[in-house]
Amino acid sequence: MNKTMQAILQALSYGGIEVEAARWIADLKKLDPLRIFVKKLDIDIYNNEYKVPVRLYFADEASMESGNENVPVILFFHGGGWTTESVETYDRVCSRMAQSIGQLVVSVEYRLAPEHRFPVGFEDCYAAAKALFAGELLPRIRPEQITVMGDSAGGNLAAAVCMKARDTGDFRPQRQILIYPALSNCYTEDSPYESVRTNGTGYLLTSEKMADYLELYESKPEDRKNPYFAPLCAEDYTNLPDTLILTAEFDPLRDEGEEYGRRMRQAGCRVRIERIEGALHGYFALGIQHLYVQESFRHINRFLSVERALNEQRL
């Protein structure tokens, strides 16, 4: 990375979170002039009495007209530090994903902190996953066709959903894709992960911001010991889904994502860990013309292709 770019990033990498200002900035993406037009459908699922909005993105006209029969699905949880972003601000990301992967994408509008602290947003995501796997959301979809996926805070939620599903036996995801996931419970100098220090300033997402996000997300200090809050707090990494983890070189979350993969692998799980060299946290939301995004989709499509072959063998 050249010195000019480093200077620009340093100027933009301020610490601290002001939630309303961050949401206002995120909402500017709703005005996206490069919006990708694909077939969409907005529906609701229930988390007890609360309606959780979800949006379906169809890869093409044929997949929509098929009645969703035998269509592979990505269940997606957006990032945003558990406090910002939405289905609407991630519209381009999910539209592009449907086109680039060729699968139906289901994006979940989970409730945000600090108005709704842990475990509310997580439980919204779990309810959506449970409904999808049970056939309540899309009756013709087979459970083995579903991939659970998320980026950043959404990667945290995806990992936690898969972990709780294993613990409860409510359903059994066969695969998950975690993009620069937030999996730890500490972003101070006490963090065991070196990238929190080496990448914690000067690369847009700072360790100070991550510490603030955790404070806004938690309901009480004890939450930080809960593996559904911070999956790296788990004691058991066995029997988790086949997993692809993508990390970014200049990201404070890099090392924790890679450590999560190593722990899963040591526990006997099938895991691929791919570091996107030169990338910063948040790169996945950039346009498809960006090389980091293209590289990520190559990894994702390769992972899903291998998984399809394995699934056929299982059948």
Regions picked out by a protein language model, each given a short descriptive name:
Residues 30, 37-44, 49-315:
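Alpha/beta-hydrolase superfamily serine-hydrolase fold, recognizing
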Residues 1-44:
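An N-terminal hydrophobic leader/cap segment in hydrolases
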